[in-house]
Amino acid sequence: EVLPSEQSCIDMGLKYVNNDACYPSLIVVGQIMEALLSGRYDLHKVAVVITQTGGGCRATNYIGFIRRALEKAGLEYIPVLSLSLSGIEKNSGFKITPKFAVKAVQAAMYGDLFMRVVYRTRPYEVNHGETDALHKKWEDKLCAELADNKFGMKRYKNNLRKIVEEFDAIPVKDIKKPRVGIVGEILVKFSPTANNDLVNLLESEGAEAVMPDLVDFFLYGFRNSTFKAEKLGFKKSSVILSTIGIK
C-alpha cells in the first residue's frame, strides 16, 4: 500500500512536527500519522520502518520526529525501526531477507522505468490518456507480482522488456518539445504533493519533464559509504554492503 499523499498529510505533519522542521519531514510524519490514525490498521500489530542516512540531512532525524509524534498521539507503544546501512540502531526481530531485498530493488527499478517511459511518451501521445492507462495496467500487474511468494529474474527481465515495447507502441506526434529537468531535495523532487504536481504543470505548459532515477540516489549513497570507509576511517563493514548494493 502506498501511503496517502494529499494536503491533509501536510496538515497532519504540521500538527505533530515542530514548525522549524524541513518540509519533507512534515510530509513524511504526516503520511505515517494519517495512515495510523485512519482506522485501517490494528495499532497493536503494526510497526513503522524508516530509513536513516546517517548524514547531516534531517532525514537522519525522521525517526525521532516519528517517535515524538506517536508519543503526542498516545501511540508510543508502536515500534519505530531504523533501516540504515550505517547501523545507527539495532532492531532485534527485524531481518531483511535476500528475497525481500531483491524485490525491493526490482520495485525501485520498475518505478524508475515507469518515470522514463511515461514522462517521455505522455506529452506526445496522439490519444489522450493512453499512456496513463497503460501505466495503470502495468502498475496493477507488477504490484500483484511483487506481493506474491514467487521469485525469479526471468519474469523480472521479461516485464522490463514488455513495458518498453508496449510504451514504444503508443502512437505519438512527430513534434519536439522543450525538455525540463527536475532537480532538488529527493522527496520534494519525486512527490507530486510536495512539488505541487510539477510534472503535470510542465506538461500542461507544453514541456516534457525529465526526472533523474531514484536508484541513482541509492548508488550515490553506496559510493559515499565506500569513500568514507576508505578515506575517512569509517567502518569497513559498510563497504561490503555498499559493494553488494552497487552490483
Locate predicted features.
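An N-terminal assembly and electron-transfer interface module characteristic of large anaerobic redox
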Residues: 1-247
